[in-house]
Amino acid sequence: MIEVPEDNRSSQTKRKNTEKNCNELMVDEKMDDDSSPRDEMKDKLKGTKSLIIRKSELMAKKYDTWQLKAIFLFSAFICTFAYGLDSSIRGTYMTYAMNSYSAHSLISTVSVIVLMISAVSQVIFGGLSDIFGRLTLFLVSIVLYIVGTIIQSQAYDVQRYAAGAVFYYVGLVGVMLQVVLMLSDNSSLKWRLFYTLIPSWPSIITTWVSGSVVEAANPLENWSWNIAMWAFIFPLCCIPLILCMLHMRWKVRNDVEWKELQDEKSYYQTHGLVQMLVQLFWKLDVVGVLLFTAGVGCILVPLTLAGGVSTNWRNSKIIGPFVLGFVLVPGFIYWESRLALVPFAPFKLLKDRGVWAPLGIMFFICFVYQMAAGYLYTILVVAVDESASSATRIINLYSFVTAVVAPFLGLIVTRSSRLKSYIIFGGSLYFITMGLFYRYRSGQDADGGIIAGMVIWGLSSCLFDYPTIVSIQSVTSHENMATVTALNYTVFRIGGAVAAAISGAIWTQSLYPKLLHYMGDADLATAAYGSPLTFILSNPWGTPVRSAMVEAYRHVQKYEVIVALVFSAPMFLLTFCVRDPRLTEDFAQKLPDREYVQTKEDDPINDWIAKRFAKALGRS
């Protein structure tokens, strides 16, 4: 065999790539002639996106030994441990912060705001990560995380705390998304669930540590410093993962393929900053994102503000944003369907059940959680007489169960190669959990039932939540993986925002009247409503005032759980609509051009159900 010199091989490869690109361009132009200008508009940043994805695949191949993979997973574990512990106790600190502002009922208002902002930021982070790379967006997210943490820690009113929470949550969801994408980039479909479950593992530790941390930190007086210290703890915990990504880039630097990719120019290099910004404006659908955020936010936030000690539905500050929201939503629909060049939720991707079914499930997962557990910490402390540490542990117990089961489930899935059966079984467990939450809502004997509910919830989360994420990734290509993953988390947080609004509306509209009814004293009811965690210090368990407070909480929590139970039904029905492709050793599905979803795989469970129905109908 005659060996071709290295330079000649490189030039031949480049020539072949050039010919291939020319042929693909001719095919694209031919197809574009038969398509409408808007529907088949060429994504001018597609070349840059493809370049980043090809680089990530080459980098992933360099971590091909079990030692390097173990180091990478451990680095991801350290990062997720840091933000997992922080987020598990920061929710508790928010309760104490609102209590210090005498605005405890506004927890749901802050939750709606941050969930909506963080939801749409997922789409932006997903789009930008394919253009600028995972590591760059990871670093940007860390900066936002730090800025938000500092603002929150120094806030002395609800408005400033909410502003800090927006920066913090945008940074948090950015970090979470980039970690998931890094793990996905470095795993085959068969091992995807195992890698995706890595962020849940820290809960094995944080569930038990978080309660002790909260108790030792004395958040009633020191919540500000307790938040501030994470501005330097979290970045330090991210260093190992950053070093792993840099090490991958260093190992791949001498590869011929990598050098060829380095020679390729991005859209920014060929067209300049101005054209790049214009394309990003359309690519990220900035107008659509703003219309969606403003419209839905204006509808949801007033729901959490209209109630309380006195009703505010006649106040123009409540009615104005509420009406504006309903005006903006049709504007958003018109923009996305008629004017947006690149809709942030592409219809071609959403129209297949392999995508819309998992997205629907993710909406209901966060919706049900926020409805049933949005005020659970306060319920445990006030109505069940739990300490701060035990209440924190109980809230995080479901994460602990998920983390314990996760490694075993991940390994089992690598052998079974399908996910749908786990998703269906996990979805059915939600009914048991909500039933327990309905039965055990108050009283010192309720803690056992709530703990049992959280344990079952954790098991269902492991079998249901994470396989659903992998399911939507497994039906599309690597190029669309970031898009569907970002959409997944976006819809997830929108579900939480909607639930927080409904939960807050129920809480603010119902709690004060019930407190007034059971206590019979307006001053006592107002104090108990505004700062319950301070109020119970002077009204210990067993006193008539505390008993009246418990009855009021029990009554309101009943409606919260009923709504969660009702919406568990459509969530379960959607499990039968997800696709069930085989999980292979590939990074993602290999699809022909202009195909977004793998539709040719069989679906054993749906096929079996269809045969049973056909057989039953035949007999009748």
From Swiss-Prot:
Composition bias, Basic and acidic residues: 16-42
Q: Which organism is it from?
A: Saccharomyces cerevisiae (strain ATCC 204508 / S288c) (Baker's yeast)
Q: What does this protein do?
A: Involved in the transport of siderophore triacestylfusarinine C and so has a role in iron homeostasis.
Write out the similarity annotation.
Belongs to the major facilitator superfamily.
| GO annotation, cellular component aspect | endosome; endosome membrane; fungal-type vacuole; plasma membrane; vacuolar membrane
What is this protein's name? Siderophore iron transporter ARN2
Keyword annotations from UniProtKB, A to Z: Endosome, Ion transport, Iron, Iron transport, Membrane, Transmembrane, Transmembrane helix, Transport
Ranges annotated as spanning the membrane: 71-93, 106-128, 135-152, 162-184, 191-213, 223-245, 286-308, 318-335, 355-377, 392-414, 421-438, 448-470, 491-513, 561-578
Reply yes or no: does the keyword Lipoprotein apply.
no
Molecular functions (GO terms): siderophore-iron transmembrane transporter activity
Cellular localization per UniProt: Endosome membrane
